[in-house]
Amino acid sequence: RPKCCCVCGVVGRKCCSTWDKCHPVHLPCPSS
C-alpha cells in the first residue's frame, strides 16, 4: 500500500508506493 503522498503540480495529490516516486514534494500520508 502507499507509504507516502506527494503533490505533483496540476496533477494534485497522489499516493505513491515508494518515496522515490514522490515528486516534486514529499508529504506524509493522512492518518485517517
UniProtKB/Swiss-Prot annotation:
Q: Report the domain of life of the source organism.
A: Eukaryota
Q: Recount the PTM note.
A: Contains 4 disulfide bonds.
Q: Which residues carry this modification: 4-hydroxyproline?
A: 2, 24, 28, 30
Tell me a GO cellular component.
Answer: extracellular region
Q: Which residues form a coiled coil?
A: none
Q: Which UniProt keywords apply?
A: Amidation, Disulfide bond, Hydroxylation, Neurotoxin, Secreted, Toxin
Single GO term (MF): toxin activity
Main localization of the protein described in the UniProt heading: secreted
Residues with the Serine amide modification: 32
Q: What the record says about its domains?
A: The cysteine framework is XXIX (CCC-C-CC-C-C).
Q: What is this protein called?
A: Conotoxin Cltx-4
Native source organism of the sequence? Californiconus californicus (California cone)
